[in-house]
């Protein structure tokens, strides 16, 4: 511990100070970094309470060395947690200063003025009561708390608190005090370093003072008193700062949750848009087969009519090639009588072979009929011009056939029904005598 007050070294419990009633482990915990060393001095021996004797692992100095104890003990320790991030100890025993303040203290051995005032306020002393260097004897904190039982044997300085003299109306110093009293202090500032030891029962309100000059001389007199309010407590400020820090952390967590929820919402919106597009594609694909089924009967009807036309041409060709006398009345069909196409017409069969004596004359006719049938079976739209077939009489047989066929135009894209006229057929056959 830098001084006997356990104020500066900040290690160990409340019993590590002079007269704190520390245990065997607490007596040496403040020296160094927590381990025993050859230069560690037993604090219990300095207070005349060490009962370990030769078994003590700390050094028991001679009385001549007591005057130089301040060289190694009268030091202030800075709080490194406060310098790094934040100190969470409400009753921190170390000095809350910056790294530059600590470096300046190690070089010069003196605290900056603002830190001296802060440390003195924590101890209930004036800044002048603090030791100015490492050569001075440390202050006895047990005496400041009223617990020092050593009396005149105590090797540390006994300083009186300022509020004791202020309550008595005296402004001087006493009891070994080497400084002046700060004006305007009515009561002791709350010692944040002694919170577990003192509690809240030791505080006494300041004296009341009658306020004069507020009432007229002839009127009723009312006595009013002015109460002095205590300055803000260090502990309360620390609690408020901790609460603010917790609230800030909570706000940061809520902000993170909001950002996560926004990202999840964007992903869900994208998935919803994808599902809507998939539904549209499924609807279009289900409509396409229905259109194909609607167009199928039309194609079948056209094919049926093509077969009917082919059958008509085949019938005409077979009738024209029969060598029998036929009158013109039998060959003329009623005008405007439509020929009903067969529903399930079989593909046209090949025409029967002509007689041997008509083969040279019938060959051009068969080729023309085959070409006409091929044109009738072509895919729609189909347009057929009137076909006129004439057979010149080479032999004694003369065959003349004219078959005017009206133009037929079929389109399955406009209407499923196909209407076509069939004109009258005329055929003149002259039979030659043998």
Swiss-Prot record:
| Listed Pro residues bias regions | 339-358
Which segments show compositional bias classed as Gly residues?
12-35
- Which residues fall in a coiled-coil region? 234-280
Q: Which GO terms describe its molecular function?
A: miRNA binding; RNA binding; zinc ion binding
Q: Where on this chain are zinc fingers (C3H1-type) annotated?
A: 36-63, 73-99, 134-161
What spans are recorded as compositionally biased (Polar residues)? Answer: 314-330
Q: Per the UniProt entry, what are the Gene Ontology biological process annotations, in alphabetical order?
A: negative regulation of miRNA processing; post-transcriptional regulation of gene expression; regulation of RNA splicing
**Lineage: superkingdom:** Eukaryota
Regions of biased composition (Basic and acidic residues) lie at 196-207
- Compartmental location: Nucleus
Omega-N-methylarginine modified-residue sites: 185-186
Output this protein's name: Zinc finger CCCH domain-containing protein 10
Highest lineage ranks of the organism?
Eukaryota, Metazoa, Chordata, Craniata, Vertebrata
| Gene assigned in the entry | ZC3H10
